[in-house]
Amino acid sequence: MTQSTSVSKGGRVSRKAKKNPDGTMSIVDHLRELRTRLLRALAAIAVTTIIGFIWYEHGIPAWAIGPLHVPRLPSLGEILKEPYCSLPPSARATFSADNECRLLATSPFEMFMLRMKMGGLAGLVMACPIWLIEIWRFITPGLLKNERRWTLSVGTIAGFLFVLGVVAAYLVLPMGLDVLLHLGDSTQISALTGEKYFNFVIALILVFGLSFEVPLFTAMLNLAGVVHYEQLKDKRRIMIVVIFIFAAIATPGQDPISMLVLALTLVVLMELALQFTRIHDRRAARHVSEWEGLSDDEASPLKVAPSSIPAAESIYDGDHKGIAGGGDAHPAGGSGPIPKPSPVTAPTRAPSASESPTPTPSPAPSDSPTSGSHHAPPAAVLRRGPRSWNDSTGDNDGKPGQDTIQSSSFDDVL
């Protein structure tokens, strides 16, 4: 990403960043982009926080546009305290003269801080479309087309499950409070403060909302190939027991109603996740290769049937004769007997013009009898150094074995 500088009519210098054609960005450009996204998200949260601060005490009046009539929207405080105020008057303390349901405040700044806290949470929820879009635009350039589609799908499902958990928590809250506040009503009467009550409501909403994401997390692990349906099916009973234990610990009120509602809802969602993994594994098994299930150091099976090697065919016909029969040598792959190698003769050097031919001495008679007219060839002498082959017996006082090598035939020398 590069920067272009331009000067306006008023003398102000404006710098605009130009994106590279290939989409690459430096670290400084990434930090600048992150700063821009964070500032936009924080600005949206600040605006919605102000709206939430006002909405905490004041509702939105009813209005109508033509045939469309919108009823009055209660204030945020009225919506949050409705589960508590829906209890019978005998289960809660009333301190106002008109018997209106209100929460207690035990410190001077409790009401202001509670209003700021609830306004900030409401602003964070109302601004979630904006800061989610900013996060999406920041991470999208680094994702492939397939990854963008999966991320958008997972994010949409996660948001739907969280909202479903929040609605379930809000519906189960009156039943949980009814059980808790009637356990010792013959001796005590409840007078909840605003801080403790709203903390209880927020904790219950977060527990339900985040717990509803567990089935989605299980499905994502199955898509990544970490867990499979056969593994989860064998541990279904253990999972149900773990879910009930988690619901008993996680619910802030520790009442049986909230625990049962959370546990039963999670069991249903986990069963849906298990059926998703079963369908996904069945579809993936149709397109899986045999080598995909092997480890990195295990050889894949090769289905190669052994085949016989055909015999080599000769380029000659059947009447061709070898060297022994007076014909030419067979090439590679030919058939026929292997011919006897021809004898090797001693190399000779032609005498130059300045040299006179030296008579070849007759060989010494051999004591061993010879058959026929076959005679041993003359002795050949191999001299060392730059000397050449010669038929004479050489120098060194006729001492063989020092500078000369004598043999009865050239075949013995070889």
From Swiss-Prot:
One of its GO terms (cellular component) is TAT protein transport complex. Residues 323-336 have a biased composition (Gly residues). Pfam families: TatC. Residues 1-21, 315-414 are annotated as: Disordered. It is found in: Cell membrane. It is a multi-pass membrane protein. Coiled coil: none annotated. One of its GO terms (biological process) is protein transport by the Tat complex. Keywords: Cell membrane, Membrane, Protein transport, Translocation, Transmembrane, Transmembrane helix, Transport. Residues 403-414 have a biased composition (Polar residues). Residues 345-357 have a biased composition (Low complexity). The chain crosses the membrane at residues 45-65, 119-139, 157-177, 200-220, 238-258, 259-279. GO terms for molecular function: proton motive force dependent protein transmembrane transporter activity. The Tat system comprises two distinct complexes: a TatABC complex, containing multiple copies of TatA, TatB and TatC subunits, and a separate TatA complex, containing only TatA subunits. Substrates initially bind to the TatABC complex, which probably triggers association of the separate TatA complex to form the active translocon. Part of the twin-arginine translocation (Tat) system that transports large folded proteins containing a characteristic twin-arginine motif in their signal peptide across membranes. Together with TatB, TatC is part of a receptor directly interacting with Tat signal peptides. Belongs to the TatC family. This is Sec-independent protein translocase protein TatC. The gene is tatC.
